[in-house]
């Protein structure tokens, strides 16, 4: 009798164990599929935000949206803030979170490959040049010519792609210039010094640090804002991602690779083989007539280059932006001044004037050995007012 009772007890305990394991696996599976559903809601929310932002109240304010009316688990929280010339979007669904850097599908209403304001001059195109997309130019049109003994050997612009430009470049949006102005007014004396290594999260607070005249072997992952009182040299051994840099003049050393947005009062220079990854940008505020951005050989910028204007001009032509033939910019180049561009621009080029500088002098209004083409996957910064459709920076 006692042995039967023992066996029955053991069988009962065994059945309880099996039921417990089954229930645990069921709960784990349910939890897994629930979290997968929440992640899917976050991805759907990004698509929704890219197409329509009217449900968002403003910046730095929490907004929620129920993706499927009547389904409480489909509610997603939105929080967005400006991050340089992009938007930082934080999404929450239950315990799941997603952080995205957002840009625009189009640079502005013009959707231009090349935009030159009306100056009463003809644009000369020479060498292996091509313009794929809309060309905005004054009423004098284009002429295909030669430089030295090199005749035009590129792709002619389709007549249907030539449009009439305005008297001036489209102006940057006031809210963007106001935001950048705030960057230059930071009182950095009260900030702590930057550590050599650090990692923050965009779901938290922005870290503000002051830096000296040179940074080396620094590894930071944003959101960080680093400010220097005057000139700054960034050595190529630094590894920076999601970082905003503010200084008077900035030079980035050979071989640097990272994702940074650099805002300078006077000038920015890139040495050789600098790679600025997606979500990067270079902005010079136009504080002097000698303002400039200069790219070195074999550089790549995935984001934007902006050189603001200044009413005081040098007596002789001066390149406010120089891009060598081995450099590539993917995104928007906006130069309120003279641009000396060679190489490739995948996206849009806006320039007050084009000049080709050579050893024997300079050629005004010359587009020579340049490729400017609209790329369907390009992400543009928030600079010029235009269509609201967003695209995630990847």
Give the ranges of each region predicted by the language model.
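Short, ordered "entry" segments at domain starts
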Residues: 79-212, 216-221, 225-228, 236-239, ...
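Beta-strand/loop motifs with alternating small/hydrophobic and polar/acidic residues, enriched
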Residues: 1-118, 389-394
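Hydrophilic extracytoplasmic domains
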Residues: 248-249, 260-261, 265-267, 277-394
